[in-house]
From Swiss-Prot:
The gene is VPS52. Disruption phenotype: Lethal when homozygous. In hemizygous plants, male gametophytic mutants characterized by very short pollen tubes. Male-specific transmission defect. It comes from Arabidopsis thaliana. Residues 181-203 form a coiled coil. It is found in: Golgi apparatus, trans-Golgi network membrane; Endosome membrane; Golgi apparatus membrane. This is Vacuolar protein sorting-associated protein 52 A. PANTHER family: SUPPRESSOR OF ACTIN MUTATIONS 2/VACUOLAR PROTEIN SORTING 52, VACUOLAR PROTEIN SORTING-ASSOCIATED PROTEIN 52 HOMOLOG. The keyword Membrane applies.
Amino acid sequence: MSDISIDALGQTMGDFSNHEKLGFDLGAFVGDLAFEEDSGSEDISLEGLQQELEECESDEVVANILSSGDKLREYAKGVENNLRKVELDSIEDYIKESDNLVSLHDQIRDCDSILSQMETLLSGFQEEIGSISSDIKILQEKSMDMGLRLKNRRVAESKLAKFVEDIIVPPKMIDVIVDGEVNEEYMKTLEILSKKLKFVEADQAVKSSKALKDVEPELEKLRQKAISKVYDFIVQKLIALRKPKTNIQILQQSVLLKYKYIISFLKEHGKEVFMDVRAAYIDTMNKVLSAHFRAYIQALEKLQLDIATAYDLIGVETRTTGLFSRAREPLKNRSAVFALGDRIKIIKDIDQPALIPHIAEASSLKYPYEVLFRSLHKLLMDTATSEYMFCDDFFGEESIFYEIFAGPFSVIDEHFNPVLSNCFDAIGLMLMIRIIHHHQLIMSRRRIPCLDSYLDKVNISLWPRFKMVFDSHLSSLRDANIKTLWEDDVHPHYVMRRYAEFTASFIHLNVEYGDGQLDINLERLRMAVDGLILKLAKLFPRPKQQIVFLINNYDMTIAVLKEAGPEGGKIQMHFEEMLKSNTSLFVEELLVEHFSDLIKFVKNRASEDSSLNPERSITIAEVEPLVKDFGSRWKTAIELMDKDIITSFSNFLCGMDILRAALTQLLLYYTRLTDCIKKIDGGSALNRDLVSIQSIMYEIRKYSKTF
């Protein structure tokens, strides 16, 4: 169909070309054509004309024609002539391009021929590609099959190679196991042997193989030989631990740990021999450490300084001697029984190295038992930490530690239990309780739990003993013989000083611990000493002496408690209240002693309201003797009061506080007297005998710099 169309088009183009050659003049032909008026135009229907006019109303061309006044028919003829001219021009242009169109037709026909040939060629290519695709698919299937077979062969080769490697026994391995020395190479060979033994035991398929039947006897012989050889080697190393002056930790770290794989090998392939090695190590270390601790304890015992006996109690009379008690030394030589003093340093030095006994003995030094206790347990902690970590690393067992330390624990208990049962040093016992607390914290920070149960046991044994000794002090106060304790001396009693130092010691030791049970015991002790000191005070014949005795003891107690810390707590507050109340009583006693009439008048008469009972109004005759008596001897009385206070109170500052309080109270009494005189008719007559308040204030300042 395309060929026919192209040929027809070519023929048409040829005709146009021939016409052009013949000089065919279309213009002349067309030029004779003319539009004639339609004879029937008058009969044209006007239907729809209005609509067409409305549509053309907005047309710009029509509007221009109408506005110019031209006739539509003439304008239409002009347009028709223009169209004819354009048509003729187009035909001429088409005729001019006829040769090009013929040439284009020839080119299209050539292209069509070429495309036809290409179509034939591509069809052949398509058939060949289809054939090649089929061949490629076949090759791909063959390749996948060959890849799978190769993979299977490689897997088989790998397993077979591993099997051969795991099951064969190289001659070099036999030489090393049988004849080699136990060293790093030997342990590497043991690892290889271990892998072979595990391989044989783990795989059921291997056990049924014929190859194993040839190799298994040789592997068993090597296993037995290796076990025998490493057992002898380890035993020799364990024997070295028993040699005197051997540094066990260095031997463990630098020698035994290098061969810890031997233990792993024995545990896996020689269980019975491993248990023998384990038992041998436990027995060796048990005996070695027990001997070390026993020797250390014996050396420490030579350094012990006895602090207290069963008779060193707060309420026991210092001069008491008996058949089974020694003469008592003065308190100043035995202050460590009741006062903490420098013993608190043991808490600050809690993590210092353990004592070296022979150095201390050479220096002739003696220590309270808590120092030896700390040193012993410091050595125990360090030794236990090292041994626990070694056992875990070397044997892979933590439980072995407890079997080893059963001996050392027993040795320490044999020493500590008799010491504890004969310990009457309450401060020392509390220090040991605090030491154990700090040691538990140290072991916790180290993350070593091996001493938890032992330290708990020691702590549990210390508390009942402390309670018993503390109760002995409490009983000594409750059951004290006041007749033998009493001394005709208003200065602080030695029992009260003991109590103050004893209590201050425990307050100091409880600052960072907040032990409620200890606070309760101290309160019980305070109540007991309160009762005792009041009983002793009542033995003084004069009330003033009783009060002075109580003030001196309370003041001394407060001073000692303040040394223990800035806040003495409820106990200090209690004694401060007691001091305050007794100071007020003493001031009254002192003033009554020198100004009894003045005080009696102020208390009885100055407070009366004369308006209610005019008959009992205060008169000049009643107050005049008081004024003259005060004016004649008030300075002398103050001097006597000052001397009395200085001789009565051992604490100068306390005496000055009391004197200041007494003079202040005297000034108040005298001021009330002068106020009464001002209210009496004619009282101004006594003004010349009255001592001015300024004079009294001036005199008071002479005796009190802090007034």
